């Protein structure tokens, strides 16, 4: 699997928020978007995830079987600012819904609901309504959605928001494990995710970006 973006541009209202953004990520690679609020990080993630149409440019999720690309929804997870979980349902019911909704085929990489809740360190409270939980607990369980239905590409917008230091480390470990298995990660963040050898794309607003390596 590879993720290729070529000459992307996007508009916010009447103004271009970024232009000419290109990058290539192969299996096992991560790109971290940094920059101030309003610099276009979330917009770029939504464009790559297929949720916003770019002003110009292309995004390709390709592999040997589909060199011309697959639909983002078939091969990627998008975790935005909102957790996309029903407050009235229990954690287990929410995850079971997403497990069945997202799985087009059964994969050996899919975790059970029980294993996913254990992976995010909250196996003992999955019987509780989602709305009963703290913001940090809710964010952990939102991340568990990525584990119950495998997708090779993770697109993450501030994935560690509302988390404490121990949860930050736990999430970094889960992301590193995904990369080690050949996954791809594109993430926007205001703080380091602790990823080894991650590339950085610093967004500064209209047209301005810098490239580097950031851990």
Swiss-Prot record:
Keywords: ATP-binding, Cell inner membrane, Cell membrane, Cytochrome c-type biogenesis, Membrane, Nucleotide-binding, Translocase, Transport. Pfam families: ABC_tran. It catalyses: heme b(in) + ATP + H2O = heme b(out) + ADP + phosphate + H(+). It is a peripheral membrane protein. It is an enzyme of class 7 (translocase). The keyword Repressor does not apply. Residues 3-211 form the ABC transporter domain. InterPro entries: AAA+_ATPase, ABC_transporter-like_ATP-bd, ABC_transporter-like_CS, ABC_transptr_haem_export_CcmA, P-loop_NTPase. It is found in: Cell inner membrane. One of its GO terms (biological process) is cytochrome complex assembly. The keyword Nucleotide-binding applies. One of its GO terms (molecular function) is ATP binding. Its main location: membrane. One of its GO terms (cellular component) is plasma membrane. ATP binds at residues 35-42. Its EC number is 7.6.2.5. PANTHER family: ABC TRANSPORTER I FAMILY MEMBER 1 (PTHR43499:SF1). The complex is composed of two ATP-binding proteins (CcmA) and two transmembrane proteins (CcmB). Part of the ABC transporter complex CcmAB involved in the biogenesis of c-type cytochromes; once thought to export heme, this seems not to be the case, but its exact role is uncertain. Responsible for energy coupling to the transport system. Belongs to the ABC transporter superfamily. CcmA exporter (TC 3.A.1.107) family. This is Cytochrome c biogenesis ATP-binding export protein CcmA. It comes from Rhizobium etli (strain ATCC 51251 / DSM 11541 / JCM 21823 / NBRC 15573 / CFN 42). The lineage of its organism: Bacteria, Pseudomonadati, Pseudomonadota, Alphaproteobacteria, Hyphomicrobiales.
């Amino acid at each position: 699997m590879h993720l290729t973006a070529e000459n992307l541009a996007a508009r916010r209202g009447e103004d271009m928020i970024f232009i000419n953004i290109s990058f290539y990520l192969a299996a096992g690679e991560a790109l971290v978007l940094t920059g101030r609020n309003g610099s276009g990080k979330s917009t770029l993630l939504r464009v790559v995830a297929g949720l916003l149409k770019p002003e110009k440019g292309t995004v390709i999720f390709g592999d040997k079987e589909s060199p011309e690309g697959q639909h983002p929804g078939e091969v990627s997870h998008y975790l935005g600012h909102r957790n996309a979980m029903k407050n009235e349902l229990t954690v287990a019911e929410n995850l079971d819904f997403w497990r069945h909704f997202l799985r087009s085929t059964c994969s050996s990489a899919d975790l059970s609901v029980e294993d996913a809740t254990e992976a995010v360190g909250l196996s003992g409270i999955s019987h509780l309504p989602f709305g009963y939980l703290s913001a940090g607990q809710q964010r952990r369980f939102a991340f568990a959605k990525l584990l119950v239905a495998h997708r090779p590409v993770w697109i993450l917008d501030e994935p560690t928001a509302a988390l404490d230091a121990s949860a930050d480390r736990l999430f970094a470990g889960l992301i590193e494990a995904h990369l080690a298995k050949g996954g791809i990660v594109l993430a926007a963040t205001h703080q380091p995710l602790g990823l080894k050898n991650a590339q950085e794309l610093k967004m500064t607003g209209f047209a301005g970006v810098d490239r580097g390596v950031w851990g």
